[in-house]
Curated annotation (Swiss-Prot):
CDD domains: OMP_decarboxylase_like. Its EC number is 4.1.1.23. Substrate binds at residues 18, 40, 67-76, 122, 183, 192, 213. The active site is at K69. It catalyses: orotidine 5'-phosphate + H(+) = UMP + CO2. Belongs to the OMP decarboxylase family. Type 1 subfamily. PANTHER family: OROTIDINE 5'-PHOSPHATE DECARBOXYLASE. GO terms for biological process: 'de novo' pyrimidine nucleobase biosynthetic process; 'de novo' UMP biosynthetic process. SUPFAM superfamilies: Ribulose-phoshate binding barrel. One of its GO terms (molecular function) is orotidine-5'-phosphate decarboxylase activity. It is an enzyme of class 4 (lyase). This is Orotidine 5'-phosphate decarboxylase. It comes from the Bacteria.
Length: 238
């Protein structure tokens, strides 16, 4: 299924709750208040009770991106996706392998769950791909997987904003392009290698931006989020 691409920046900013405990996640959400409506929950928080926390966010009318990067045999993927669809979360990731994506799309049919195919992690560059046994460079592999996700009927993909413009040209206007590795000007890259500022990512064609450390690690989290939202609104719909 496709997902609505929000014109309002608050629906396009996804804050990554990359924290070790539910208590810390609750503190982040409380501090951000009404400024942020969309949160990403990944492995770190899932293994600390994050699935129940995801349900509580949904009950509080927040949107949840469950970043599980699933990859397994078709039947296992399908059964897992069926249960995730019942949780009421908005987005779920799986690795962009054709058979897995097709199984997931069929399992999510009739629900509001937007399935996202993960192309190449933003922490990886061409040298990392060669070490892992891939012969394609990052952009070639990203575009190949983006096209496969589109053909499978996925709602969107996860990819670096560096490749967003080429992806948008390849898959058209309807798929979500969700971009991690977003760093405001002057921020440190951390362990990310293919990064971009919020404004540049939107200009390149990204539909949603994932921001974690620049907000969660800021002394004033709400001020950091509002600054990014202001930058996003200055660009408008890409």
């Amino acid at each position: 299924m496709t997902t609505e691409l929000h014109d309002d920046a608050s629906g396009r900013l996804i804050v990554g709750l990359d924290v070790p405990t539910i208590a810390e996640a609750e503190k982040v959400v409380e501090e951000l208040g009404n400024a942020v409506s969309f949160y990403k929950i990944g492995y770190q928080l899932v293994f600390a009770g994050g699935l129940d926390f995801a349900k509580s966010l949904v009950a509080a009318r927040k949107k949840v991106f469950l970043d599980m990067k699933l990859l397994d045999i078709d039947n296992t993927i399908a059964k897992g996706v069926e249960n995730v669809a019942k949780m009421g979360v908005s987005m779920l990731t799986l690795h962009a392998y054709p058979k897995a994506m097709r199984a997931a799309v069929e399992a999510a049919r009739g629900s509001d769950l937007c399935l996202l195919g993960v192309t190449v992690l933003t922490s990886m560059d061409n040298a990392d791909l060669r070490e892992a046994g891939y012969f394609d460079n990052a952009e070639t592999l990203v575009l190949k997987r983006a096209r496969q996700a589109h053909e499978a009927g996925m709602g969107g993909i996860v990819a670096s904003a560096v490749e967003a413009q080429a992806i948008r040209q390849a898959v058209g206007p309807d798929m979500a392009i969700v971009t991690p590795g977003i760093r405001p000007a002057g921020s440190e890259k951390g362990d990310q290698k293919r990064v971009m500022t919020p404004a540049d990512a939107l200009r390149a064609g990204a539909s949603h931006l994932i921001v974690a450390r620049p907000i969660v690690g800021a002394p004033d989290r709400k001020a950091a989020a509002l600054a990014i939202l202001k930058e996003m609104r200055s660009i408008g719909r890409s």
